[in-house]
Amino acid sequence: MVEYYDVLGVQRNSSPDDIKKAYRRLALKWHPDKNPDNKEEAERRFKEVAEAYEVLSDSKKRDIYDKYGKEGLAGGGGGGGSHYDVPFQFGFTFRSPDDVFREFFGGRDPFSFDLFAEDPFDDFFGRRGHRGNRSRPGGGSFLSTFGGFPAFGPSFSPFDSGFSSSFGSFGGHGGFTSFSSSSFGGSGMGNVRSVSTSTKIVNGRRVTTKRIVENGQERVEVEEDGQLKSLTINGKEQLLRLDNK
């Protein structure tokens, strides 16, 4: 039988933060899209890691698991307990590991920033992400889990700040594409600012398009490797100064 603490490589007295860090590391390591040559094992490990995180990240489920084992979560009351000792008498159904992954990362593609950073969450705490259906056309585009999200709409994240959304996908030979959007409401009516950003990495170059709409004015900036290449305000292209970076 799978032992959830062993799956995540943590101790029984590990803190919730330790559980989150362990899941983050192992989910990124065993994501099936990252292991095309070892997909069968990756899918099994990815599922086990998601199950372990679902249980150990929830204090009530973790307490039941510690007392009764996995049978307790199914309402069976293992480990010497009785069925009626278990609060979850109707059983607990595990979600899809993809859903757990999407929710944990708030809909944002964890591979769009430094995958090997000590704590990639440092890059997007407080961000808000959309959840969507996983789509893997043509045998599976890399991390297309994050494709198909609307620019704005209902969203959910464990680290919800209530103003932004983001997602991304890898598209075959076209390079990685990521999108993010933010909307800020001011104190008065009409004082609204929205920002949407699209980033493409094509042939080793990062091309970022930022669209800012504020008080009826639209500003579109296009940067290549951090250097501003074009600026358009309300559909009219602006002359750039040579010292623009």
Swiss-Prot record:
Q: Which GO terms describe its biological process?
A: chaperone-mediated protein folding
Keywords noted in UniProt = Chaperone, Cytoplasm, Nucleus
Q: Which GO terms describe its molecular function?
A: Hsp70 protein binding; unfolded protein binding
The GO cellular component terms are: nucleus; perinuclear region of cytoplasm
Q: Which PROSITE patterns match?
A: DNAJ_1, DNAJ_2
Question: Which Pfam families does the annotation name?
Answer: DnaJ
Keyword Nucleus belongs to the record: yes
Q: Which top-rank group of organisms is this from?
A: Eukaryota
Q: Which InterPro entries match?
A: DnaJ_domain, DnaJ_domain_CS, DNJB2/6-like, J_dom_sf
Localization terms from the record: Cytoplasm, Perinuclear region; Nucleus
Function, as annotated: Has a stimulatory effect on the ATPase activity of HSP70 in a dose-dependent and time-dependent manner and hence acts as a co-chaperone of HSP70. Plays an indispensable role in the organization of KRT8/KRT18 filaments. Acts as an endogenous molecular chaperone for neuronal proteins including huntingtin. Suppresses aggregation and toxicity of polyglutamine-containing, aggregation-prone proteins. Also reduces cellular toxicity and caspase-3 activity.
**Name by which UniProt lists this protein:** DnaJ homolog subfamily B member 6-B
Q: Which organism is it from?
A: Xenopus laevis (African clawed frog)
